[in-house]
Every structure is written in C-alpha cells, then in structure tokens.
Amino acid sequence: MKLVICGKGGCGKSTVSALMARELAARGEKVLVVDTDESNFGLYKHLGLEQPKDYMESLGGKKGLGERLRKFMRSEGKEKLSILEDFSLEDIPTELIVGEDGIKLVAIGKIHDFGEGCACPMGALAREFIQKL
C-alpha cells in the first residue's frame, strides 16, 4: 500500500504522517516514510529518529539531477526522463535509511542553504521514487 499525505504548509502533514506511521507499525506493518518536503526538516523529529542523509546526494546531488532534467528538456520530450533504475527497498543504500520500531525513513532531498535555488530536481526525484517503489 502506498499512502501520500499532502496539503498546504502548516496544515499538519508531518504530524499526520508520523501518527499514521506509528499506528501502522504498531499493527505490525512494515512502514517506509518517504520525506519529500524539501524545505521542512521536522518529520524525522516527529518520528523520533535521526535525520537521514539526502537520497538525492547518492545520485549526484542537485547538480547531477538538474543536468538530467535539462537534458530531457533539451530533447523536447523525445528522450525518456528516467532518474532511477527500477529498484526495491533492499536496493536503497543502508546509510540513507534511518529507522527503528518498524518505521524506516528516507529523505529525498532538502534545501540546506539560503538562496540555494530551485527544488525542481527534488520534486522530479520524489515523483519517480514513489512511482517505482
């Protein structure tokens, strides 16, 4: 089952996500929380976990992903945009996943510095990550 929590900023997405993850884990489900919010660093705290490393960095960071997106745009859609190969949870490097008590967390990417620029590569990666998982 895949479940996506979305909404306006400040409406409680992180709180609902953490509560849902805890409840599903308490029922014996294996839970993977995918943090796709590039500007909010709070979800790992709601889950009581350490902050994970950005998944995006394992793929060349924002610069590497941005170049893939630009190549796709220059092809005017003739090339297929594929950031990730097909994968399973076991294929995700262990250093990019944090977790305990039946809950695992992966963070797609975060804006770490003021004025860092566009988060478009993170959005594209998040979309494909969730589709292929």
Residue ranges and their predicted role:
Residues 25-101:
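N-terminal phosphate/diphosphate-binding loop that engages ATP/GTP or pyrophosphate donors
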Residues 5:
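Hydrophobic anchor at the beta1->P-loop junction of P-loop NTPases
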Residues 16, 20:
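Hydrophobic positions on the alpha1 helix immediately C-terminal to the Walker A/P-loop
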Residues 78-133:
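Phosphate-binding/switch loop-helix module in NTP-utilizing enzymes
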Residues 13:
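Conserved lysine of the Walker
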Residues 10:
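Walker A (P-loop) phosphate-binding loop of P-loop NTPases
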